[in-house]
Regions:
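Switch/connector loops and helix/strand junctions flanking conserved nucleotide-binding motifs
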Residues: 7-10, 51-57, 326-329
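Substrate-engagement module of ASCE P-loop NTPases
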Residues: 18-40, 338-341
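Extended alpha-helical interface modules used as scaffolds for assembling large macromolecular complexes
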Residues: 62, 123-328, 335-337
């Protein structure tokens, strides 16, 4: 496993450093070409695919199997393999967590399944997280914690990228397969780093729809984003979401909105220039995280966000407007009949 990616990705917009790093890597990989008579078989993984100037230009005898459907199961664990080879471990985990066998299987699937490397392929479980879960007999964000994606966050902020769009993006095979240091599109980097995967495919136009593969990646990545976008430090960040959820569950909407407002304090000039996108990104992060513990429907359009948030006992219908008053937002809720679907619901409506 040759992880060349990090130094190059951390200097993605420094062309001089990119050239230096490529010139270091090319002779390293070139040895595989000159010594191919002594190598019967080699499998290279963890290698980033860059466009224009490749570190493999001297190594033309490689076969790229990244999106070859014959090899989709080569670097992960299938559900069938879990039940064939790891059945005892599943039952031991269920016992340790006081869960049924069925509940344990569903939780494993939710947390660690979902990787698709070509269209219409079988879902693959993350082997690192899966095996660590069995070894420790407890669920955890094992893969995510091996490397925090600071360079991806900097790339997203550098390109002023819409996080909602990132989590629901559409692209083609050429974009997925090559990272261009001159491009402002962060999606190929995020995809090749394992934080996005193929969710759907349109064969007519050759378009892939991407998304987060599973809960470990989605919650870990979005939670990691919070202190980079909102006015909250990294230590307090996990507790802020916990407080959010409690306030929502108990109907303490005054505290909820005060906490939300505090996230926008001390906004920098750079952020003010991209104010609408910044607000949308913070809302996306907050309600994405709250949505792991409550039911959230989130829609965004030019200058406004519609939100329905449901708990066991309460329903919140919200309208956020960038340029407008609270009265106008409330009038929009009334005029558009946003609360109508809940008219016969027994829960308290805000």
């Amino acid at each position: 496993s040759l992880h060349d990616a990090l130094p190059i990705l951390q200097n993605l917009h420094d062309e001089d450093m990119q050239d230096q790093l490529r010139n270091m890597l090319k002779p390293f990989y070139g040895v595989l070409k000159t010594m191919d008579g002594a190598i019967r078989f080699a499998l290279l993984t963890g290698v980033t695919k860059f466009g224009k100037v490749s570190v493999f230009s001297d190594l033309n005898n490689l076969m790229d199997i990244s999106m070859d459907d014959r090899y989709v199961e080569i670097c992960g664990i299938t559900e069938k393999e879990i039940h064939t080879c790891l059945e005892d471990e599943v039952r031991e985990l269920a016992g340790a967590q006081d869960m049924t066998y069925e509940e344990t299987c569903l939780r494993l699937k939710e947390c660690y399944d979902g990787y698709h490397f070509v269209e219409n392929s079988i879902g693959m479980y993350n082997p690192f997280s899966l095996l660590n879960t069995f070894a420790r007999r407890k669920f955890g964000d094992y893969w995510f914690e091996t490397g925090r994606p600071s360079y991806l966050v900097e790339l997203l902020k550098h390109t002023h990228y819409d996080l909602y769009e990132m989590a629901n993006t559409e692209t083609d095979v050429d974009v997925l397969n090559s990272i261009d240091s001159a491009s402002i599109n962060p999606v190929p980097v995020i995809y090749q780093s394992g934080y996005l995967t193929i969710k759907d495919y349109d064969p007519e136009f050759g378009i892939y729809r991407l998304g987060f593969p599973n809960r470990e990646v989605e919650e870990g990545f979005v939670r990691f984003l919070l202190p980079f976008y909102a006015n909250v430090n990294k230590v307090e960040s996990p507790f802020e979401i916990q407080k959010f959820v409690r306030e929502v569950r108990f109907g303490d909407y005054d505290s909820f909105f005060r906490r939300l407002q505090s996230f926008f304090a001390n906004t920098t000039y750079e952020v003010i220039r991209e104010q609408e996108l910044h607000y949308e990104n913070v809302f996306f992060i907050v309600f994405k995280l709250v949505g792991f513990y409550t039911q959230v429907e989130y829609h965004t359009s030019k200058g406004r966000i519609d939100l329905v948030l449901q708990t066991d006992k309460l329903i919140y219908v919200m309208e956020f407007k960038l340029d407008g008053t609270a009265e106008e937002a409330l009038q929009q809720i009334h005029d558009k009949h946003y609360a109508l679907p809940f008219a016969s619901d027994g829960r308290k409506l805000f």
